[in-house]
């Protein structure tokens, strides 16, 4: 077999493969054996029909065509390996020459991974926010902690914002009560705004036992979207009584004996949170910088697939929450054209980021050890409510395990870039990022640019497999037949 490669674009190549007829003999023999088992010919037992009889009954050309179809996947795979083609899509195969006894010539056009010219890592620089925790932020956290330990005390006064009230609710439309729109003894925090629009304004100032009626739009039920009159009756008013901010509170609310120690711990935790946010900010800005500096073409087929995957996930999520695309776009304040353009842009960035990080993985020979993989498996298994071994088996059945490994590898590549990049704060002071020693579980889960899809969707797997040996890549899609294909079922002739 002879294979030659022609570069059509930075992301697409054309393979021309020439195969002598003798090299097709194993596939031809296998086709005869298969047909001998399938075809029933009077006077011959199943599996014992001679090739010459099959030629007479089915036609030599039909049999040759089926043999070629059998041989194409392996021939294509060998050509991919020989030419070191890093395939990213199923090939478009065209048989250009074939005759009985003559050579087989076919072409295969396929999308490939583009070459990525990485910049010097030391030339990379990002600016992040400094880790600053103010006294006001510390006191805000202490206030939230006090709020958690607050006691509700009954009061004899009108309702105020921040009170907790017990409410009886009823509603009517067109003068008729709405079935199912009644509630008794409902506990509600006034001012939270999480119950009915207009309720807060209506009951502020009401006394215990007083009823207030207001008009609002129904958001659910058979009459959703209609105007209704809602009556709210106050059945009790309580206010929050906050504990004193002193050493006794520190002892009650924490493991510390003094308020100063508690305040110091709160500050320390806030600083740690800011450092974690700083790492996330550096990751995001570094990826943005790389996308601006590195030219990475994206195959059209890959971009279309990523957009389709994102649209599918969105449709599934909208269905789960009981809404549709039009309503969702209305909440975003976007037209369909604006939203589609945004999806296309983010999808392209996701793929380009993958290509860049994968190039770093290759350039630096980044690997993954068993411990890193198991940490991820255990964490995600717990999050899914499954035993780790069961979750691992589910991953292994599809492409999930390789996608998970690719996630970890790309995170390690990104951390390597951050370790070598110049990181400063807004005033130009050097910043030492608090990078973990190894990728934390789901460290990149919210990083859209990294292109991670935790349902196993991945564009280019760097979990150590050979792209040329990929089953999906090695099987030509809809290869044109030289003649009519032979049926694979049993036949009576």
Swiss-Prot record:
Organism superkingdom: Bacteria
Enzyme Commission code: 5.2.1.8
Ranges of Low complexity composition bias in the record: 474-485
Short name of one Pfam family: Trigger_C
Molecular-function GO terms, alphabetical: peptidyl-prolyl cis-trans isomerase activity; protein folding chaperone; ribosome binding
Record protein name field: Trigger factor
Keywords attached to this entry: Cell cycle, Cell division, Chaperone, Cytoplasm, Isomerase, Rotamase
Keyword tRNA processing: no
Gene Ontology BP terms: 'de novo' cotranslational protein folding; cell division; chaperone-mediated protein folding; protein transport; protein unfolding
Domain (PPIase FKBP-type): residue spans on this chain: 162-243
Record's subcellular location: Cytoplasm
Function, in words: Involved in protein export. Acts as a chaperone by maintaining the newly synthesized protein in an open conformation. Functions as a peptidyl-prolyl cis-trans isomerase.
Biased composition range(s): Basic and acidic residues: 449-470
Domain notes: Consists of 3 domains; the N-terminus binds the ribosome, the middle domain has PPIase activity, while the C-terminus has intrinsic chaperone activity on its own.
Catalytic reactions of this protein: [protein]-peptidylproline (omega=180) = [protein]-peptidylproline (omega=0)
Family, per entry: Belongs to the FKBP-type PPIase family. Tig subfamily.
Chief subcellular location: cytoplasm
Region (Disordered): 432-493
């Amino acid at each position: 077999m002879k294979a030659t490669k022609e570069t059509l674009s930075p992301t697409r190549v054309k393979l021309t493969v020439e195969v002598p007829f003798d090299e097709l003999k194993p596939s031809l023999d296998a086709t005869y054996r298969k047909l001998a088992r399938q075809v029933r010919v009077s006077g011959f037992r199943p599996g014992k029909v001679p090739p010459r009889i099959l030629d007479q009954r089915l036609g030599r050309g039909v049999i040759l065509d089926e043999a070629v179809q059998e041989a194409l996947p392996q021939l294509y795979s060998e050509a991919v390996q020989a030419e070191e083609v890093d395939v990213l899509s199923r090939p478009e195969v065209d048989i250009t020459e074939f005759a009985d006894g003559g050579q087989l010539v076919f072409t295969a056009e396929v999308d490939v991974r583009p070459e990525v010219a990485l910049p010097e890592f030391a030339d990379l620089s990002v600016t992040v926010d400094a880790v600053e925790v103010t006294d006001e932020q510390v006191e805000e956290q202490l206030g939230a902690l006090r709020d958690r330990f607050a006691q509700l005390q009954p009061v004899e006064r009108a309702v105020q914002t921040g009170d907790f009230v017990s409410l009886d609710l009823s509603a009517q439309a067109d003068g008729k009560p709405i079935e199912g729109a009644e509630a008794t003894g409902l506990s509600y925090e006034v001012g939270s705004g999480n119950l009915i629009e207009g309720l807060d304004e209506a009951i502020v100032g009401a006394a215990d036992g007083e009823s207030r009626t207001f008009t609002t739009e129904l958001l659910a039920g058979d009459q959703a979207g209609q105007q209704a009159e809602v009556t709210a009756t106050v059945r009790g008013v309580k206010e929050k009584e906050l504990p004193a901010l002193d050493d006794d509170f520190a002892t009650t609310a924490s493991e510390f004996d003094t308020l100063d120690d508690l305040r110091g711990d709160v500050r320390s935790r806030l600083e740690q949170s800011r450092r974690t946010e700083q790492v996330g900010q550096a990751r995001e800005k570094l990826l943005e910088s790389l996308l601006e500096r590195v030219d990475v073409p994206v195959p059209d087929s890959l971009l279309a697939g990523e957009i389709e995957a994102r649209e599918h996930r969105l449709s599934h999520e909208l269905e789960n929450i009981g809404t549709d695309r039009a309503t969702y776009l209305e909440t975003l304040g976007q037209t369909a054209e604006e939203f589609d353009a945004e999806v296309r842009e983010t999808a392209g960035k996701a793929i380009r980021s993958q290509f860049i990080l994968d190039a770093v993985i290759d350039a630096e020979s980044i690997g993954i050890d068993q411990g890193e993989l198991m940490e991820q498996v255990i964490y995600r298994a717990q999050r899914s409510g499954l035993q780790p071994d069961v979750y691992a088996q589910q991953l292994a059945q599809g492409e999930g395990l390789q996608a998970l490994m690719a996630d970890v590898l790309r995170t390690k590549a990104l951390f390597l870039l951050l370790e070598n990049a110049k990181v400063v704060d807004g005033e130009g002071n050097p910043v030492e990022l608090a990078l973990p020693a190894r990728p934390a579980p789901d460290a990149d889960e919210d990083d859209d640019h990294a292109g991670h899809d935790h349902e196993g969707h991945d564009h280019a797997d760097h979990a150590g497999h050979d792209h040329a040996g990929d089953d999906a890549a090695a099987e030509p899609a809809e290869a044109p037949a030289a003649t009519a294909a032979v049926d694979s079922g049993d036949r009576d002739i």
